[in-house]
Amino acid sequence: AIVRTAEALGINGALLHNCCDVYNPKALRASMGGMLRLPFMQSENLAEDIKKYKSQGFSVYAAVPDASAQDITKIEFHGSDICVIGNEGNGVSGEVLAECAPLTINMLGRAESLNASVAGTIVMWEMLR
């Protein structure tokens, strides 16, 4: 669902790490074919890849359910910014988070977190604002 949304919003690409096979029929169905239209790369070492992007001038954020992280609505994003969305079970690893500026989606209700697809959608929308 994140890939489907990314492609629909015109996101430039995706860097995937520890994901299912993108050509798995269920994944292709969930993306509504977006995986065939969205440029992507597989990362073997996400923390190292993030370091490379940062050395090339990219700003890299990580979405975390942490009130001390920067409120996503207060960030002025640029077209070359990157945001890491962790998986629903473990979130963003400490090694990866150490390379990123943490951001959060402030929630008014009692939910502790959002699922990855919903969080990813909100993050992408805010980054394009």
Feature annotation, model-predicted:
Residues A1-S68:
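RNA substrate-binding interface of SAM-dependent RNA methyltransferases
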Residues A8-L9, C19-V22, A27-M35, G94-R129:
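Structured adenosyl-cofactor binding patch, chiefly the S-adenosyl-L-methionine
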Residues G57, F77-I85, I122-R129:
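Short flexible/disordered coil segments
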